[in-house]
């Protein structure tokens, strides 16, 4: 395995710009939510789920603007922020082609099918670090049942993370954009993340989600290359 960070720009190109645009839209959603919560609290009342209705056109606009790449978007709340829901996910996704639907999962910690978003990387890292994060690829069992990459960032109020705003990209949408460029090159290539997990590959031997066995031996080099990459912390490798 050979690290090829120098060709990342050629492979991603306008795709990186599109993903940065999605990140910007998620940031806009986070700003709107932060302003909404601040306004409600300044009126000396606690926020409730009904207050979030005003965010739905913004979420729908994000989904429509990047429809072939973005499968879901919304906000996930820190426990106790909403007065009428100990935990809450205001998340909308393309279940069918007609219109976005609200995601419904069981948020009761005592339930056997409890969806524990607090432990999810896409929530936990932005909430604890105060910085944006890219998670994946992983199989999104809670929503799409497809390989996804989640872009997320914290919603901060007085320095505290009160929610996380995010968006799910489907890996198949990334493949449509990037694989044709990969296949034009002379050698098989893959994009891998800092953990050595394959995001995209032009080789049938390496599919999204697989851990490359050679990654462990050069993990520090992979992590350094991914840390320098933006907006996606991935690095191309050749076989």
Task: State each model region's role.
Residues 144-178, 237-239:
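Conserved beta-strands of PAS-like sensory domains
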Residues 68-129, 200-202:
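Extracellular/periplasmic ligand-sensing ectodomains of membrane signal-transduction proteins
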Residues 66-68, 118-133, 220-232:
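Soluble sensory domains of the PAS superfamily and closely related sensory modules
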Residues 205-239:
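Extracellular/periplasmic juxtamembrane segments that couple receptor/chemosensory ectodomains to their
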Residues 1-47, 147-148:
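Juxtamembrane extracytoplasmic/periplasmic/luminal helical "stalk" adjacent to the first N-terminal
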Residues 80-82, 158, 189-199, 204:
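Short, glycine-anchored, charge-dense loop/turn motifs used at functional sites
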Residues 118-143, 171-182:
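Short, basic/aromatic recognition patches
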Residues 169-199:
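Solvent-exposed, extracytoplasmic
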């Amino acid at each position: 395995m050979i690290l090829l960070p120098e060709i990342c720009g050629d492979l991603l190109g306008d795709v990186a710009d599109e993903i940065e645009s999605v990140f910007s839209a998620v940031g806009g959603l986070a700003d709107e939510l932060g302003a909404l919560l601040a306004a409600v609290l300044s009126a000396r009342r606690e926020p409730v789920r009904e207050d979030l209705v005003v965010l739905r056109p913004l979420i729908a606009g994000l989904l429509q603007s990047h429809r072939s790449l973005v499968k879901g978007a919304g906000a996930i709340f820190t426990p106790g922020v909403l007065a009428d829901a100990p935990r809450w996910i205001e998340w909308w996704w393309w279940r069918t082609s007609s219109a976005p639907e609200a995601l419904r999962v069981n948020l009761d910690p005592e339930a056997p099918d409890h969806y524990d978003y607090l432990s999810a990387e896409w929530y936990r890292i932005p909430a604890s670090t105060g910085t944006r994060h890219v998670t994946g690829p992983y199989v999104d069992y809670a929503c799409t049942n497809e390989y996804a990459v989640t872009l997320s960032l914290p919603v901060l109020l007085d320095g505290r993370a009160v929610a996380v705003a995010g968006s799910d990209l489907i890996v198949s949408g990334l493949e449509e954009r990037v694989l044709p460029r990969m296949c034009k090159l002379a050698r098989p290539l893959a994009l891998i993340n800092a953990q050595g997990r394959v995001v995209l590959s032009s080789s049938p031997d390496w599919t999204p989600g697989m851990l490359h066995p050679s990654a462990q031996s050069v993990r520090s080099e992979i992590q350094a290359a991914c840390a320098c990459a933006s907006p996606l912390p991935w690095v191309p490798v050749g076989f």
